[in-house]
Regions:
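Short glycine-/aliphatic-rich beta-strand segments at the starts of folded cytosolic domains
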Residues: 1-8
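Short, surface-exposed connector motifs at secondary-structure boundaries
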Residues: 1, 25-27
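Cytosolic Rossmann-like ligand/nucleotide-binding regulatory domains
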Residues: 31-34
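A structural detector for beta-sheet-dominated domains
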Residues: 8-10, 60
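Amphipathic alpha-helical interaction surfaces in cytosolic regulatory modules
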Residues: 12-25, 36-51, 70-71
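C-terminal structural segments of small proteins and small subunits
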Residues: 50, 54-79
Length: 79
């Protein structure tokens, strides 16, 4: 089941922490913003997105909410 969340990365430190958490996951995650899709574990990819607004994060597996809670705005849906 795919989990989709909207998150906000407000600062450079938020991006660094988010990438670190994504690198610890045993599965991949993708970040979507305005038609672009990047790997959540790639810091340069994230910085290429418009981070002034929420971005959509898509996970291929269930995740531990404690890892993502600081960035979460709202849960969109499960697919």
């Amino acid at each position: 089941m795919t989990k989709i969340l909207m998150i906000m990365l407000n600062t450079i430190e938020d991006v660094k922490k988010f990438v670190q958490e994504m690198n610890n996951l045993p599965y991949g995650a993708k970040v979507h913003s305005r038609g672009y899709i990047v790997h959540a574990s790639r810091i340069m990819g994230l910085f290429s997105l418009d981070l002034s607004e929420p971005v959509k994060v898509e996970f291929d597996e269930e995740l531990t909410w404690e890892d993502i809670e600081p960035f979460k705005i709202w849960e969109v849906h499960d697919e």
